[in-house]
Amino acid sequence: MGCGSSSKKGKKSEKVVRAALIIQNWYRRYRARLSARQHYALAIFQSIEYADEQGQMQLSSFFSFMLENYTNTHKEDSALVSRLFENTRLESKDREEYVGLIDVPDSYDGPRLQFPLTFTDINLLLQAFKQQQTLHAHYVLEVLFEARKILKQMPNFTRIQTFPAKEITICGDLHGKLDDLMLIFYKNGLPSEKNPYVFNGDFVDRGNNSMEILMILLVSFLVYPTDLHLNRGNHEDFMMNLRYGFTKEILQKYKLHGKKILQVLEELYTWLPIGTIIDNEILVIHGGISESTDLNILQQLQRNKMKSVLMPPMSTNQECNIKKNKAGPSEQSASEQLTKLEWEQIIDLLWSDPRGKKGCYPNTSRGGGCYFGPDVTSKVLNKNQLKMVIRSHECKPDGYEICHDGKVITVFSASNYYEEGSNRGAYIRLSYGTSPQFFQYQVTSTSCLNPLYQRVNAMEFSAFRILKERMIARKTDLINAFELRDHSRTGKISLAQWAFSMESILGLNLPWRSLSSHLVSTDSSGSVDYMSSFDDIHIEKPMKDMKSDLIETMYRYRSDLKIIFNIIDTDQSGLISMDEFRTMWKLFNAHYKVHIDDSQIDELASTMDSNKDGNIDFNEFLRAFYVVHKYETPESPLNK
């Protein structure tokens, strides 16, 4: 009896164990599938982000092209070239023009700063921003002017000592995400003499609270100028702000004085230090290095000459051409520009990314800077008697990443960067003679508390949504590529042919075969119905009878065109003349090799001038180009 009972219990236990193992294996496979989907979604987000930055960097070559051509065709208009290539000279203007003439009314119920600033003002600002109050333009401008005054006295690289017992915190990109900064201060404490910080660039753009972050950092810097350190990132650049949102944010929050704020901010960026060196061992820079990185050159160049990474130095011929066409004497000379070598040194510092492959080669994803391998890291560190590079610039799923045998650390402080739940944020604490300590976090909201599969669904939905927008902007080119391989005109090609066509046209370096089930229909034999790629999406036409190639071109380059025409609009009226539109479009057409007939452009310009006054509201026109999705929720067939 006893033995039989024991045998039954043993068999029952075996069944329980087997069932538990089956459930465990199923759950592991389930988590692996979710992890793969999350990985693909992040790959899409990052590829498109870098492709956009590549497009932004390509504007640099267009501006050089424009400099050669626009000044020849519009000799009477020197304001545009001045705006693009000449440094702002705020010193020649009375500060009272910006600050003194702006009164703070009694009705203003936001924070009132008292200069000279103290720790109380930092707290006041934090509490006000938590309550979604807006700092008055008078105080914003005063903070910008005061910060500029101190920044101008600082070297290109700030040097910090943690020896013997000091700790310092290093934060990466924040990108306008105020909740992340608040969480860092909550977990790690506010800046002070005993709690120093380095903020490693990219404070602004993308998020909705770039101004609030900038004001908190600058006010903290003014209170603790030797304990809070600010490095310039690639987004501390007025041209980047035009594309990625900070300019728009300022003009919306400060409708009356936004233009003044932008002008002062444009110059303040140029005075931000380009790096920090800790204990003569650790180099903290925003992007990275290259095999030609020379700290001697970087420490001696005049950083304020770098107005924008998109504004390359003028050649002597270009400078002479501008002077010849200007009505008055030129205030800018070649000596007031960076040399090409100096400009490239800063580009590498702000834009480069580490890779596992040895060597140094062009950063084709971003279009600026380089990829640098572990051998390059060792060479630059050894040459300068340094031990480590801490950089930011790249979103990492865990908020940080260590590579190059521990000699390069990436730290990224904006959690949920692409989408809720897409990544953690992190910061680093350093003290002398010890290994870096990493602290991770993630700002939580109602959606972040959802089950993992719902968060992955939401990420995946957003990722494929923006990928489809990329596809529709190249619809004509994609169809031509598909039809080139569809010799029998069946409307179908192989999966390999479809994947090759997608990569050759879009150039996003994505695993197209793995993504195909979300993007296209296949038959039982595995052949791809390539036109199904566009079944659930189209670009809205702002005008009837507009040709598809023109629609796609305008949509594809809408961000670039918006930047270009905002620069042409020197008086910020929102209007440009018909002649300016035609001339600039033809230059754009020639440089980007866009095949649009001049007759189409003339017709387009005439249609855009709705009231026939010779002016065009170009920003309003661009807003008329938008993509229509048939499915707008994560529960759509896209995710089933």
UniProtKB/Swiss-Prot annotation:
Which residues are Ca(2+) 2-binding?
609, 611, 613, 615, 620
The active site is formed by: 235
The segments labelled Catalytic in the record are 122-445
Q: Name one GO biological process term.
A: detection of stimulus involved in sensory perception
Q: What is this protein called?
A: Serine/threonine-protein phosphatase with EF-hands 1
Residue sites binding Mn(2+) 2 per the record: 202, 234, 286, 393
Question: Which intervals hold domain EF-hand?
Answer: 473-508, 556-591, 596-631
Ways its activity is controlled: Activated by calcium.
* Record family assignment: Belongs to the PPP phosphatase family.
Per its database record, what is this protein's job? Answer: May have a role in the recovery or adaptation response of photoreceptors. May have a role in development.
Organism domain of life: Eukaryota
Residues bound to Mn(2+) 1 are: 173, 175, 202
InterPro entries cross-referenced by the UniProt entry = Calcineurin-like_PHP_ApaH (IPR004843), EF-hand-dom_pair (IPR011992), EF_Hand_1_Ca_BS (IPR018247), EF_hand_dom (IPR002048), Metallo-depent_PP-like (IPR029052), PPP_dom (IPR013235), PPP_phosphatase (IPR051134), Ser/Thr-Pase_EF-hand_contain (IPR012008)
Q: Which residues bind Ca(2+) 1?
A: 569, 571, 573, 580
Q: How is the cofactor bound?
A: Binds 2 manganese ions per subunit.
**GO molecular function annotations of the record:** calcium ion binding; iron ion binding; manganese ion binding; protein serine/threonine phosphatase activity
